[in-house]
């Protein structure tokens, strides 16, 4: 054993070991994430952001955040038909402690997509770029599968190439018709029950019977210039649950009645 002093222990350990550890969460604030009034449950959840310090404004750090929420959570529903749809909401503005979101896309869960792909059938897909009446450019993906006819004795149900082309053309026509004649809010209302996919399945029965027809994905490629009035209209009173956003609070604050001679309490520290 070497004889001598241990320099590290004699000086009290490493340099900087007595530095005070500050919890980073003390510098952050919680904000409520609000969904548009197309959904039943307006209170999506909460999100963290650093407090405003100098030129770093908290609201700037929140704008542009994308939240992915299951449709079952947005509709307060435990139905399995809703749980595999995921809606993306993007934060567009901040009012007080509320983060106002707008529709940013839709997708199906991976396990649902994998469970639909099977042998002895034909998978048919299509994608269409369509523009809504209020200027949103969307890319809509549709998926469907062939199914055996009730009188067929075959093991397989493969469609011919000409039938696949005809079904894909029918998908494109119905999606273009339903989206181009609607604004973004109406498109989302059609995506909630998936009425577009049901129309496709019904209209393609004469070409080849289909099942498991879904709008697989919706992407927002381009959006018009940000309009605060339109966003506040989306977050107005729509019968949804949760705290609604008041337009008066957004524009000039809320008027609170105070008794005469009221004085605010003196704070000990700022």
Curated annotation (Swiss-Prot):
One of its GO terms (molecular function) is structural constituent of ribosome. Coiled coil: none annotated. InterPro entries: Ribosomal_eS1 (IPR001593), Ribosomal_eS1_CS (IPR018281), Ribosomal_eS1_euk (IPR027500). Residues 1-21, 238-270 are annotated as: Disordered. Keywords: Cytoplasm, Ribonucleoprotein, Ribosomal protein. The keyword Methyltransferase does not apply. HAMAP family: Ribosomal_eS1_euk. This is Small ribosomal subunit protein eS1.
